[in-house]
Structures are given as C-alpha cells and as structure tokens.
C-alpha cells in the first residue's frame, strides 16, 4: 500500500506548473502633470519623461528609482527634445539593467531655455515639493503597465552638467532643512550622482553642505579631464583644504574622459 502525494503538482492538472516567463523591460514615455509651468514667453510648458524598468523589477511591490537630469543638448548625438534619446545616447537603460543595484529609471526632458533658467522657472519647477510629487506620479505611471502599484524603497538622483540648475537649489533646500526634504521620496534619498555639476564656487559648497546635512546619503562627484567643473572643484578644495570632506562624499577625476563621456561610461558604476 502506498500514499500518493501531490507536492509540486497543479490540482486537477496532474502536471507541475511551468515557471512564468520573465516579463520584458518596461519602456514608456509619458507627459508629467506635475512638472508644468508658464515660461518666460507666458507659454505653458509640460515635461515629457522616459521610463525604464528592468525585467527583474517588473511587478515588484517595492523598487528603487533613479531620476536622471540631463544637461544641454550639446553632446553628440543630440537628443532633439526626446527623453528616450537621452536614455539611448547615454546608454542609461543598459547601465541600469546591468548595475548590481537594481533600480527603475526615469529621465525627464528639461527645457533648458536661457530666459527660463535666468528667471528661476526651472529650479522652481523642480523644487523639493515637486520632486516628491513627481516621484509619486512616476510610480503611478509604472503601475499602469504593471500588476501592482510599486512603492518607493530608495531614491537616487543623478545629474550632468547644466543639471546644476536643479541639483544645486535642491541641495540648498536640504541644507536649510526645508520641510519637503524630510518627507515623501526625498526622505528616502540614498544616493546622489553629480557629473561635472559645479560651475561656480557656490555649487561646490552646496554639494558639500548637502552631504553634511544627510550623512546617511552617499554622494559621488565625477569630473571630466578638463573644463569648468573640474577647475572649479579643484580651486574650491585648494581654498578649503583645511576643511575635510564629508565622509559620505567621494569625488572621481576621470583623467581620460571628456565632459560628454561621463554619463554614458560611468553612471551605472555609481548606482
């Protein structure tokens, strides 16, 4: 006499359930209803955004999210007002997909209009409160193409070049203890990747102060072999050599790489 068991069998089918095929990565574009503003020409501007979610993170209940802010459209090839081209030109999707730390990615298209920058419209549009709301909007957009609506585990912010006009004001809000930096997505900030960001001494100070104000957050500053940002940073550190860097801030001089090489070669390294 024997007892027949059904471990590993699907009831009623008599066969083991085949493993589910992995979902393909999610790639989509959406228009943000959070980052909207009236520009210097009194025209309403919206923000097109590209999302990439690696296959390994599809339908996960909790995810890390990378927000990457690009610079001016001066690198080759150009991105031509298309956030998906920013992703492809800098291989951000491939880097995120292959990174040890798995994370979803969103790249908003920033309209780097000189008048709008000078008048503060862009930095206002990306101030702390709007960043928090934007992250929630991104999670909602991911949910539309998923079985679950993910919640945020950790936030990673990255930026290149002219993105100083977003990262520096945000850094100063953190340093001043602005309430929105202590709640929502920004309360879950775990990493900042700043590539050729400082263009003025104030920017270098802001990044250092940001690191000091959030000792649990890791900061990575990457610099090209030549140009204004590495020069500014070198001068700043020489002037303040007696002040040690925060222990959670590292800077890297990429002595063989040009300004436009940085995001495409190294962004994934710092995730």
Task: Locate each region found by the language model.
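Extracytoplasmic/secreted cell-surface and envelope-processing proteins
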Residues: 75-78, 114-118, 165-167, 200-205, ...
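Active-site nucleophile loop of the alpha/beta-hydrolase fold
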Residues: 108-110, 191-201, 224-227
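Alpha/beta-hydrolase fold nucleophile elbow
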Residues: 148-161, 192
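A domain-start/cap signature at the N-terminus of enzymes
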Residues: 1-65, 103, 238
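Active-site machinery of serine-nucleophile hydrolases
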Residues: 62-65, 69-141
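Conserved hydrolase catalytic core segment
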Residues: 169-188
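Glycine-rich nucleophile elbow surrounding the catalytic serine of serine-hydrolase chemistry
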Residues: 70, 158-170
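C-terminal catalytic histidine-bearing segment of alpha/beta-hydrolase fold enzymes
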Residues: 211, 220-271
